[in-house]
């Protein structure tokens, strides 16, 4: 995945968060973070590595926010009345 697609995945996760699709946002961020790690291993250019680290930090903060919202969510149990 290219850097542009990783940035797009992070932006998509942010959009999903705004819309309330927390699990979709989390999935997008997991994919983006995995690919950021792969890109960081492959690059030798210092400026690119700094940019990747900055984007990783941004994505991790967003993931923390999403995890917090998921943890705060109250599950509604529906019981059948017999």
Curated annotation (Swiss-Prot):
Name of a matching Pfam family: DUF5475
Record InterPro entries: DUF5475
Protein's UniProt name: Uncharacterized 9.5 kDa protein in HE65-PK2 intergenic region
Source organism phylogeny: Viruses, Viruses incertae sedis, Naldaviricetes, Lefavirales, Baculoviridae
């Amino acid at each position: 995945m290219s850097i542009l697609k990783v940035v797009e995945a992070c932006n998509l996760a942010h959009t999903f968060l705004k819309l309330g699709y927390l699990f979709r946002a989390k999935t997008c961020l997991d994919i983006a973070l995995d690919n950021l790690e792969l890109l960081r291993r492959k690059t030798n250019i210092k400026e690119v590595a700094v940019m990747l680290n900055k984007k990783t930090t941004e994505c991790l903060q967003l993931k923390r926010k999403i995890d917090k919202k998921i943890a705060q969510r109250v599950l509604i149990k529906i019981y059948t009345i017999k």
